[in-house]
């Protein structure tokens, strides 16, 4: 079991703790599939909703909050029945808008894993306005069920009435809808090819700046992030932050980064290079490779 989960395990009921320990091996990064979840439910003798709330301390152990020192965990449950954990990330010395909220982390985890619908968000405190707006960008976002300790399960619309969202800007394919943007570049570099693939899957209906980041560690492992825009603009999730969140979930230290690539579309009305460089340089001493590509 990874050391980062030791304190969290102590907070779980003993039957659940015993059942989940085998999952928390060196490769665990916050994903529990539907079959594993069923095993945990049987072992713990908990109702599903009770179990999901009980697992929040495990999600919170994924957090890296050097500024607030406040660990927040969130879980996104997909239509597949799988659950995806996420946690808050803060970048040392950088402005607070560089932070990743736990709900963003969990949702991006589900998105990168191929989920097309998120049905439930489980979190240990009421989602902030920023996160409510981010959830609202999803397919059927207003219907996503919000689970909070000691509170009735309510749809997002309960927490965000009279919402402004993608439909108000005539967007008919919101976040989690499969994106297919063709970006071409003649390269045989596996890392650049990976970044191109993820940029083509990014969500940028408002600026058309389809973009992604791929980070490589010294052992050759890669961690990706896609740009995820929001109708309210500010809650948009930057690809660098998503990639760093992915690294954190996999228990990698940011000092292990030895290469970083940002790919973005030449047709976008903005550029993410400045924000990406600021975020990267707060955690690693490595130059950002910035590649602008033509969309087909």
UniProtKB/Swiss-Prot annotation:
Residues the entry annotates as binding substrate: 88-90
TM helices/strands, residue ranges: none
Catalytic site positions: 103
Intrachain S-S bonds: none
Keywords in alphabetical order: Hydrolase, Metal-binding, Zinc
GO MF term (any one): cytidine deaminase activity
One cellular component (GO) term of this entry: cytosol
Amino-acid positions noted as binding Zn(2+) in the UniProt annotation, renumbered to this chain: 101, 128, 131
GO BP terms, alphabetized: cytidine deamination
Cofactor(s) in the UniProt record: Zn(2+)
Pfam families: dCMP_cyt_deam_1, dCMP_cyt_deam_2
InterPro entries: APOBEC/CMP_deaminase_Zn-bd, CMP_dCMP_dom, Cyd/dCyd_deaminase_Zn-bd, Cyt/Deoxycyt_deaminase, Cytidine_deaminase-like, Cytidine_deaminase_bacteria
Catalytic function, reaction form: cytidine + H2O + H(+) = uridine + NH4(+); 2'-deoxycytidine + H2O + H(+) = 2'-deoxyuridine + NH4(+)
Note on cofactor: Binds 1 zinc ion.
EC number assigned by the record: 3.5.4.5
Keyword Protein biosynthesis found: no
Residues of the CMP/dCMP-type deaminase domain: 47-167, 186-296
EC class of the enzyme, as a word: hydrolase
Subunit and partners: Homodimer.
Family recorded in the similarity comment: Belongs to the cytidine and deoxycytidylate deaminase family.
Function: This enzyme scavenges exogenous and endogenous cytidine and 2'-deoxycytidine for UMP synthesis.
Listed name of the protein: Cytidine deaminase
């Amino acid at each position: 079991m990874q050391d980062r989960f030791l304190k969290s395990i102590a907070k779980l009921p003993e039957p659940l703790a015993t059942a989940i320990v085998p999952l928390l091996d060196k490769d665990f990064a916050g994903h529990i599939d539907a079959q594993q979840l069923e095993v945990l439910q049987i072992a713990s003798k908990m109702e599903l909703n009770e179990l999901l709330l009980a697992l929040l301390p495990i999600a919170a152990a994924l957090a890296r909050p050097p500024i607030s020192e406040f660990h927040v965990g969130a879980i996104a449950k997909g239509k597949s029945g799988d659950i995806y954990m996420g946690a808050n990330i803060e970048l040392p010395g950088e402005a607070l808008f560089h932070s990743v909220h736990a709900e963003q982390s969990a949702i991006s985890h589900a998105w990168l894993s191929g989920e097309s619908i998120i049905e439930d968000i489980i979190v240990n405190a009421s989602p902030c306005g920023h996160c409510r707006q981010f959830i609202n960008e999803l397919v059927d976002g207003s219907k996503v069920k919000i689970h909070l300790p000691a509170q009735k399960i309510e749809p997002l619309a309960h927490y965000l009435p009279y919402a402004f969202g993608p439909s108000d800007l005539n967007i008919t394919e919101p976040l989690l809808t499969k994106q297919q943007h063709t970006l071409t570049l003649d390269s045989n570099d596996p890392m650049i090819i990976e970044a191109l693939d993820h940029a083509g899957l990014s969500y940028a209906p408002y600026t058309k700046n389809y973009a992604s980041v791929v980070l490589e560690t010294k052992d050759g492992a890669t961690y990706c992030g896609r740009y995820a825009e929001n109708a309210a603009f500010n809650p948009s999730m930057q690809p660098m932050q998503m990639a760093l969140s992915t690294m954190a979930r996999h228990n990698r230290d940011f000092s292990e980064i030895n290469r970083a690539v940002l790919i973005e579309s030449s047709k976008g009305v903005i550029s993410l290079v400045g924000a990406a460089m600021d975020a990267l340089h707060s955690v690693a001493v490595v130059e950002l490779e910035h590649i602008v590509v033509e969309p087909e």
